[in-house]
């Protein structure tokens, strides 16, 4: 019996031991991956590609091939010191197929780099890892890009992820300036072309692509135009504006001339509806303008222009053959190529220098003479009543009727509106120009306001001509073209000008001025010049389809130069010389002089300013015919307020123009 019990006990023990061993083996088979060897060398025993291709099933049951990892290249990459499982956290064993942890985070290049950068910043080691900061900036740009948006056809996927462009196992951007970096740069189109096959084909056959084949490392590749990470849809304004600027990185001269055109001015203001580089030259299949395949070839150019200048609803009028001789990249620096632009520009510069040299000198000397006289007590304005009859002491002289005053006010308002809207386009890269355009809404609206102001000014000018003509016709027998009441310059104006300069330098008395001084006549006739030059060129630019039907296209190049430069001359002259003559001379302080608003001038001031006319009227007994009561106090106050507002607005415009020039706008 004991023997049987012992045998039974032994059998039971054997069964238990066998069960335990079996259980241990089973547990070992399901042990966590951390207990297994998962270093890079282990991974590479399969993933180096030397044992044939590796395939894994996709969610739809199909198989996909895994890329082989070149051990040598991985060892030279930026990730060389990282373990495979640092990214592939879901892999927990070294058996094929791998057992994976359910719910493990997927590989996320962007978040990993952001976490590393944040850790470096917290540890105050950001300065030691500048490249990581650049990567973090790239990640931020990528997350806002078109590539980071859901794919239209497969919404569960993004348009592109990091590994679509970067081989994460061999990634290593060569240092700038090295031959390797140049080679890497030329390889960019091949990467982009994996998705953008049609664009790659167009680019490869283009002028840029052919240069790449010749190993011209300066040629443009995808990233030069579209950037590397901050990529947005090509139909967006941001893309259109940035790509246009990118063209200028290589084509500097062409871009500078483009910026000077109306197309470029609107573009620089931040609006993308005018023609840009790609609209004229194409985007990928770009050819030199002499190539018959080029959009800008002489046989294709008109058709290209007509894509925008189509005459359709909400589009500019149809471009005509005259457009062909317009030089979109004409400049004032190349006489051999653009002689008409060169000559026009030089003539305008000479005009500006001549006008301002004379009149700023005139103003400076005048200020000095009046200031010196006031300081010495030789000339106290508006108090010369010793010889006036008592009944005239408070009287005013009527100088301008209601029609002229209203015309002057409307003219001033239209000119200031033209300056505001025009100079915003003339200096588009200034912050104030962008603010002005935003206030109007768009350059289109600002352009409409600009033209409305121009038509108002032209209308006032036309009415003035009609009234003047009728007045001369009615008084034809007595009117003297060179008489004292005429605006036509005469010999006395020359003598007065010489006399003024003698007075400025203390070599003679102040000359007695007639009804219209020589500087007032200059102001008057300057309007005729401005209407012809600024108005004429403006009408040409406003109606190019009409002009191009009769004149060659290069007249638009001249019109652009003349319109802008002459407008600057007029604006700066008005807000410096004209303002000084009428408001800021020592005898006129404090401003404003309100004669153009009240229409009258005190008799004392009239005698001081127009002594020759005063003496003539006294001598002929006509003075009383011009005398009127002084305007009421409320009307005078309102006139002063209006005058100060206009002066303030004009000086503000002058400051904005100065900011434009100081910023290198022109």
Residue ranges and their predicted role:
Residues 23, 27-29, 42, 123, ...:
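Membrane-embedded alpha-helical bundles that constitute the cytochrome b-like, heme-associated redox core
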Residues 1-17:
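Bacterial N-terminal signal peptides that target proteins for export
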């Amino acid at each position: 019996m004991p023997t049987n019990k012992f045998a039974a006990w032994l059998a039971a023990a054997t069964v238990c031991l066998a069960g335990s061993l079996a259980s241990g083996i089973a547990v070992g088979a399901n042990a966590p991956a951390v207990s297994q060897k998962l270093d890079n060398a282990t991974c590479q025993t399969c993933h180096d590609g030397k044992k044939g291709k590796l395939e894994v099933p996709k969610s739809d049951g199909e198989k996909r091939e895994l890329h082989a990892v070149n051990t040598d290249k991985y060892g030279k990459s930026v990730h060389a010191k990282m373990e495979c499982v640092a990214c592939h956290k879901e892999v927990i064993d070294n058996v094929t197929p791998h057992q994976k942890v359910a719910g493990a985070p997927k590989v996320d290049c962007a978040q990993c780099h952001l976490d590393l950068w944040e850790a470096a910043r917290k540890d105050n080691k950001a300065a030691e890892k500048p490249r990581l900061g650049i990567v973090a900036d790239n990640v931020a740009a990528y997350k806002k890009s078109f590539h980071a948006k859901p794919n239209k056809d497969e919404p569960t996927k993004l348009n592109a992820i990091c590994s679509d462009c970067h081989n994460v196992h061999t990634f290593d951007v060569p240092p700038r300036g090295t031959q390797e970096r140049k080679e890497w740069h030329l390889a960019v189109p091949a990467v982009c072309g994996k998705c953008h096959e049609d664009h790659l084909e167009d680019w490869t056959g283009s002028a840029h692509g052919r240069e790449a084949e010749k190993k011209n490392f300066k040629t443009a590749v995808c990233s030069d135009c579209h950037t590397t990470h901050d990529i947005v849809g090509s139909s967006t304004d941001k893309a259109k504006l940035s790509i246009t600027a990118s063209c200028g990185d290589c084509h500097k001269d062409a871009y500078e001339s483009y910026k000077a055109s109306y197309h470029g001015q609107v573009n620089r203001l931040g609006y993308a509806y005018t023609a840009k580089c790609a609209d004229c030259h194409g985007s990928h299949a770009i050819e030199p303008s002499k190539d018959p395949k080029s959009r800008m070839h002489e046989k294709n150019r008109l058709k290209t222009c007509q894509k925008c200048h189509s005459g359709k609803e909400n589009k500019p009028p149809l471009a005509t053959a005259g457009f062909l001789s317009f030089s979109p990249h004409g400049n004032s620096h190349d006489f051999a190529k653009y002689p008409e632009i060169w000559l026009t520009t030089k003539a305008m510069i000479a005009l500006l220098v001549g006008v301002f040299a004379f009149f700023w000198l005139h103003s400076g000397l005048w200020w000095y003479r009046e200031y010196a006289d006031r300081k010495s007590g030789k000339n106290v304005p508006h108090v010369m009543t010793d010889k006036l009859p008592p009944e005239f002491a408070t009287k005013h002289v009527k100088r301008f009727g209601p029609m002229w005053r209203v015309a002057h006010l409307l003219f001033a308002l239209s000119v200031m509106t033209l300056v505001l809207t025009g100079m915003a386009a003339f200096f588009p890269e200034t912050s104030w120009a962008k603010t002005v355009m935003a206030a109007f809404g768009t350059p289109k609206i600002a352009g409409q306001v600009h033209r409305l102001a121009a038509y108002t000014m032209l209308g006032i000018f036309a009415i003035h001509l009609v009234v003047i003509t009728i007045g001369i016709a009615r008084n034809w027998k007595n009117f003297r073209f060179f008489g004292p009441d005429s605006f036509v310059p005469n010999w006395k104006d020359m003598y007065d000008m010489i006399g003024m300069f003698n007075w400025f330098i203390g070599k003679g008395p102040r000359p007695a001025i007639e009804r219209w001084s020589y500087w007032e006549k200059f102001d008057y006739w300057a309007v005729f010049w401005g209407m012809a030059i600024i108005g004429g060129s403006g009408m040409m630019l406003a109606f190019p389809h009409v002009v191009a039907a009769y004149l060659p296209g290069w007249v638009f190049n001249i019109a652009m130069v003349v319109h802008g430069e002459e407008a600057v001359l007029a604006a700066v002259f008005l807000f410096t010389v004209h303002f000084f003559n009428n408001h800021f001379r020592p005898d006129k302080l404090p401003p404003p002089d309100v004669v153009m608003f009240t229409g009258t001038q005190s008799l004392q001031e009239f005698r001081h300013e127009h002594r020759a006319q005063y003496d003539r009227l006294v001598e002929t007994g006509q003075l009383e015919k011009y005398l009127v009561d002084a305007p009421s106090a409320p009307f005078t106050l309102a006139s002063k307020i209006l005058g100060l507002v206009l002066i303030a607005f004009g000086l503000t415009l002058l400051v904005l123009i100065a900011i434009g020039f100081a910023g290198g706008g022109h």
